Amino acid sequence: MIQNESRLKVADNSGARELLVIRVLGGSKRKTGNIGDIVVCTVKQATPGGVVKKGDVVKAVIVRTKSGARREDGSYIKFDENAGVIINADKSPRGTRIFGPVARELREYDFMKIVSLAPEVL
């Protein structure tokens, strides 16, 4: 579960390395986010020459969480890190590559471009 002030690793080549969550979108009472949720973040670390710079406010979708997500069949999927992909207003990724596995649940939230770019879908 991702909440305000959580740090996310960036799983794309947009130029950011680490994000700090400012807000979980989806209602005024919403406290936590899980895989497939959109969050507003600020870039805390960035690589030189990237698309995004340190201090930029961006939107990202959560693709991996340590706490995991429950599936329809009762199983859970957990990852070793919390990670996100920076997206545009039309839910397309800002980067051109995705690093690491992503959860199958992203298909249900219409992030098909991220799923197609990912090297592995679990």
From Swiss-Prot:
Assembly mode: Part of the 50S ribosomal subunit. Forms a cluster with proteins L3 and L19. In the 70S ribosome, L14 and L19 interact and together make contacts with the 16S rRNA in bridges B5 and B8.
CC annotations in GO: cytosolic large ribosomal subunit
SMART domains assigned: Ribosomal_L14
GO annotation (BP), single: translation
InterPro entries per record: Ribosomal_uL14 (IPR000218), Ribosomal_uL14_bac-type (IPR005745), Ribosomal_uL14_CS (IPR019972), Ribosomal_uL14_sf (IPR036853)
UniProt-recorded Gene Ontology molecular function terms: large ribosomal subunit rRNA binding; structural constituent of ribosome
Family of this protein: Belongs to the universal ribosomal protein uL14 family.
HAMAP family named in the record: Ribosomal_uL14 (MF_01367)
UniProt keyword annotations, A-Z: Ribonucleoprotein, Ribosomal protein, RNA-binding, rRNA-binding
Protein name: Large ribosomal subunit protein uL14
NCBIfam families in UniProt: rplN_bact
